Amino acid sequence: MADADREPRSGLCADGMTARELRADVPALSESAYFNFGAHGPSPKYVVDAASEYIADHEYGSGTTDPYTRAFETYEAVRERIAAFVGAEPDEVALTESTTDGINRVAGAFDWEPGDVVVRTDLEHPAGVLPWKRLEREGVEVRVVETEGGRIDREAYADAVADARLVCFSAITWTHGTRLPVTELVEIADDAGAFTLVDAVQSPGQVAMDVHDWGADAVAAAGHKWVLGPWGAGFLYVDRDAAAELAPRAVGYRSVKSPNAGEIEYKAGAKRFEVGSTTPAAHVGLTEALDAIEAVGIDAVSSRIESLTDRLKAGVPADRLLSPRRYETGLVAIDVDDPEATVERLAADDIVVRSLPHPDAVRVSVHAVSTAAEVDRLVEALEEEW
């Protein structure tokens, strides 16, 4: 085992903020060895403060400042910040509650007919399963592309999408932590004339993102995992041309050009997917979290995650490691005899991981704000499983 006190050099950033400094800003990380960022990334104090202060200012200042003007100015400011982070233009971004919310908004914008085909993989989170399962009631066929070890077979995928209307898959699998070839899968779907929707929730804050490079019609994500933002700060990218062909079923005064017009005329771009009077407080917090990640540097974050993840995998026997031995992301699936019992046992020692429904395993999420000492502690605690 490597020296627990030696930290990966990749945590350093030229602008002066380090991953260690970011960690010190997150109160929850002083309570345990936390390895569940793939589900929830605890926020720095200033992220929570920004969201709380926005609510206070919006509510307490409404006697002197129009609350709608304030909210709409904030919608646009946070939209611009999110767009810059993911490589989009502001009008291509809708503010949502979550990835699940974004996927549902897209699913509800099609005029589905019996016989239409939706394709997904067998590794999708329920966010990428349940909206399509509901459509089966309307006669929509849902095809599931089987994977092996977190990998997708290109030929099987191409066959499945040949006559599909929509394809939904994850950029990073939440089970194995594998990175799917997004651009290639999008191109195959495009050639078949299918709409492509990418679940990218495991990407922001862990890897650099450029949705234009991916070429997908839509990308749903959120900032409450690797970005360390608050719950409720979701976002949905929709290509301009793709958006023009979609008519969301959920519609309100924020969706349309003129709420009092005789006919519904949706706003251009992704704004048509926004509905009513939601607080942008969570997204205000998210912008603070994005600033923190960028202060460290996304390349430095990714490099440090790689160093710490490799350290973890070095302590896991080959027959127990379900994720690729070679690094892809900080999500690591480990085979244990009783995942739920293992999660509880580790929690009793103040080590936080989670169980997976499929494969039957525990999942460890290693972040740049994790430490080498924590990784070594986890490996030691897992040794009784082998």
Task: Report residues per predicted region.
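Pyridoxal 5′-phosphate
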Residues: M1-W386
